[in-house]
Amino acid sequence: MRGISWDHPRGFGPLPPTAAQFAATHPDVQIVWEKRSLHDFGAYPVDELARKYDLVVLDHPWVGFMSETHCYLPMDELLPRAVLEDLAAHSVGPSHRSYEWDGHQWALAIDAATPVASYRPDLLARLGMHVPTTWQQVLELGRAARAAGMRIGMPLGPVDAISVFLTLADNIGGQPFATTGRVVSNDVARSVMDAMRRLAELCDPLDYTLTPITLMDRMSTTDQIVYCPLAYGYNNYSRAGFRPKLCLYADMPSLGNDGPKGSHIGGTGIAISTKCQWPQVAAEYCAWVCGGECQRTIYFDHGGQPGHSQAWDDPRVNQLSHDFFRNTRQTIERAYLRPRYNGYIRVQYEGGAMIQKCLRDNGDVDQLVRDLNDLYQQSLGGNK
């Protein structure tokens, strides 16, 4: 069988070793893994991947499209109910149910992630400051960092811009997409864009081009970036020796009064294409690689970021990752699950570009809301 994941040690590193271990007990099975870019992970049509690969690691907003195009096999038709119930019971936050749609489970949560805070403990100590828990404290840290010749940072490319926008909207009780035909109210949008603008003033213009990976690569190789309030977590950077400078993670800071609530859940799921000639064997591999024993051992040990709560609770896993999982658990358990209907991918990319442009150009927020609502309405027609 052929599988495809995405190009980062977190996304690809564990898969060849897990395939080799699975083959040791299934000598007639060989799984060859390939990788695609982070951008293609979110944007490349998953129906095209299904024509070429048996196993695909993908993003959960695709599940509505998957359901309508029938290019993947429902896991609930391949695995015993007890297996799926166990995985659901050991989900961190809404990771497992993010792959449910129209009465079926389209993928299993092989990886779990959500926007959280990251920081350099040595640089924070140099400033004599603590990890922020509120947005106001983030801004205070940003001003102190700038005065010391450093800065805070945050990836503000289109996909990350909409991630931050929806995270902060939900954090202040804005309930994105809860009202028919509306992304958020004008008042919520104004509050969120004001918070994002005040932060962007303390960041580098380069942040508009950064992804969570490129931002963390800068934080972990230079002494420029002290702290980032919101970006998808990568536990690799909090492991000794992964990069020259150790970075740590913490729960997201709150803009509202309800703590670390509303983070825009991400992570990845593993799915089986309809072209797979050995779906039962593929499902057995998927269930094993997403299960607690594999996730807290070989999967984590080869750079993965588990989606199973047994790994998140494991003392050894937390020790080796400087408590990445323990220190971000509250955020992921209270994460926001974005829409997943067929067509939402368009909102993610085009809407993200609208938010980024409004932020960068100090645009009119009420016009942004109108544009987002129009895009939302158009997207309900599905991916064309």
Can you say where each PLM-predicted feature lies in the sequence?
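Conserved N-terminal structural module of periplasmic/extracytoplasmic solute-binding proteins
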Residues: 1-63, 375-384
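A ligand-binding cleft/hinge motif common to bilobed small-molecule-binding domains
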Residues: 61-67, 229-245
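Short helices/loops that flank or line small-molecule/ion binding pockets
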Residues: 41-52, 69, 123-124, 143-147, ...
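Glycine-centered hinge/linker elements that transmit conformational signals in sensory
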Residues: 179-210, 252
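Extracytoplasmic/periplasmic substrate-recognition and gating elements
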Residues: 240-302
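Long, aromatic- and glycine/proline-rich binding clefts that accommodate carbohydrate-like moieties
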Residues: 300-350, 357
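Hinge/lid segment of periplasmic solute-binding proteins
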Residues: 63-114, 247-250
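Extracytoplasmic/periplasmic solute-binding protein
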Residues: 106, 139-182, 225
